[in-house]
């Protein structure tokens, strides 16, 4: 068991300060009727509300790809909220780990480059 302060927080081993929440990057591939229905803008809006950083783009196969970085709890909430995007008909969401990527913000890209 690690040492905790009175607030139950565990100090960072490097600086002695309290550590920031763990960051994780995931890749989310969404298939179904997800292009030309406002899906990328919906995802950008959700990301903004949850302070998630990353990018979303259409893929040539008709799916939408999102790369998202945040703490794991917020990423889980983000994934569950994607299903509520209006006009989209989601057939499948495939989630995989992605190398940790630090984004300045969350952007909509036209296509994968």
Language-model features and meaning:
Residues 2-113:
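Intrinsically disordered, low-complexity, mixed-charge
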């Amino acid at each position: 068991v690690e040492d905790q302060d009175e607030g139950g927080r565990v100090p960072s081993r490097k600086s002695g300060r309290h550590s920031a929440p763990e960051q994780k990057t995931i890749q989310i591939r969404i298939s179904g009727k997800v292009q030309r229905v406002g899906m990328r803008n919906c995802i950008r809006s959700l990301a903004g509300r949850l302070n998630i950083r990353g990018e979303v783009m259409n893929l040539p196969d008709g799916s939408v790809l999102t790369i998202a970085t945040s703490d794991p709890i917020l990423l889980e909430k983000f994934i569950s909220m994607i299903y509520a995007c209006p006009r989209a008909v989601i057939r499948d969401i495939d989630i995989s780990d992605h190398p940790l990527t630090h984004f300045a913000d969350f952007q909509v890209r036209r296509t994968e480059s």
